[in-house]
């Protein structure tokens, strides 16, 4: 007689996809612990299926364009709201077979997953380019125009000229046909990829700045006006990476 698998063994097996036959065997197991594991497995499978379906829905934006515009670039920015640091923009052209289903609005992703997806996007993308709006440019041009210019630089820096642009809630100063998508990082895989690239790069910049300018908690707040950041401004004053046109910084001058 074959010895029944332990609940611990079944739990380990159900961490990965199993065959319908295996699942039926576990479902017929009368032990309450096994029944609980089967329910959890079905919930995880349903969640995964929903995430993949949502990715495919976002991918439809690009698929509708590809027959006429084979090279579609998604453009997004990170960092318009902080008191310190640059705005980082990214332009990303994805291959038509891109299927990294976890790619979504970077605000929905954990720090670790963003790092992993960043590496995959950089490896798989047809082309990636970055544009930077420095604090000085932000103060000179205003935040919106500085971001537009940085987006234009990101597009110009692509090593393949895109046929069409999908832009998150802004307009890029270029003659290339484009579409402005509100909440585009949740509607387009190219924009979502650009948001991840821009976010990871900007976060690393702010972590580096935290070493250069300690006392503002920049590695944690990423330049946003948290209580610790404002306390640092009050105690230590303004650094070269602060945006002097932003009122909380002006108050510390």
From Swiss-Prot:
<comment type="function">
    <text>Endonuclease that specifically degrades the RNA of RNA-DNA hybrids.</text>
</comment>
<dbReference type="GO" id="GO:0043137">
    <property type="term" value="P:DNA replication, removal of RNA primer"/>
</dbReference>
<dbReference type="GO" id="GO:0004523">
    <property type="term" value="F:RNA-DNA hybrid ribonuclease activity"/>
</dbReference>
<dbReference type="InterPro" id="IPR001352">
    <property type="entry name" value="RNase_HII/HIII"/>
</dbReference>
<feature type="domain" description="RNase H type-2">
    <location>
        <begin position="70"/>
        <end position="253"/>
    </location>
</feature>
<keyword id="KW-0464">Manganese</keyword>
<dbReference type="GO" id="GO:0003723">
    <property type="term" value="F:RNA binding"/>
</dbReference>
<feature type="binding site">
    <location>
        <position position="76"/>
    </location>
    <ligand>
        <name>a divalent metal cation</name>
    </ligand>
</feature>
<dbReference type="GO" id="GO:0030145">
    <property type="term" value="F:manganese ion binding"/>
</dbReference>
<dbReference type="InterPro" id="IPR036397">
    <property type="entry name" value="RNaseH_sf"/>
</dbReference>
<dbReference type="GO" id="GO:0032299">
    <property type="term" value="C:ribonuclease H2 complex"/>
</dbReference>
<dbReference type="InterPro" id="IPR024567">
    <property type="entry name" value="RNase_HII/HIII_dom"/>
</dbReference>
<protein>
    <recommendedName>
        <fullName>Ribonuclease HII</fullName>
        <ecNumber>3.1.26.4</ecNumber>
    </recommendedName>
</protein>
<comment type="similarity">
    <text>Belongs to the RNase HII family.</text>
</comment>
<feature type="binding site">
    <location>
        <position position="168"/>
    </location>
    <ligand>
        <name>a divalent metal cation</name>
    </ligand>
</feature>
<dbReference type="Pfam" id="PF01351">
    <property type="entry name" value="RNase_HII"/>
</dbReference>
<keyword id="KW-0255">Endonuclease</keyword>
<dbReference type="InterPro" id="IPR012337">
    <property type="entry name" value="RNaseH-like_sf"/>
</dbReference>
<dbReference type="InterPro" id="IPR022898">
    <property type="entry name" value="RNase_HII"/>
</dbReference>
<keyword id="KW-0540">Nuclease</keyword>
<dbReference type="GO" id="GO:0005737">
    <property type="term" value="C:cytoplasm"/>
</dbReference>
<dbReference type="GO" id="GO:0006298">
    <property type="term" value="P:mismatch repair"/>
</dbReference>
<keyword id="KW-0479">Metal-binding</keyword>
<keyword id="KW-0378">Hydrolase</keyword>
<feature type="binding site">
    <location>
        <position position="77"/>
    </location>
    <ligand>
        <name>a divalent metal cation</name>
    </ligand>
</feature>
<keyword id="KW-0963">Cytoplasm</keyword>
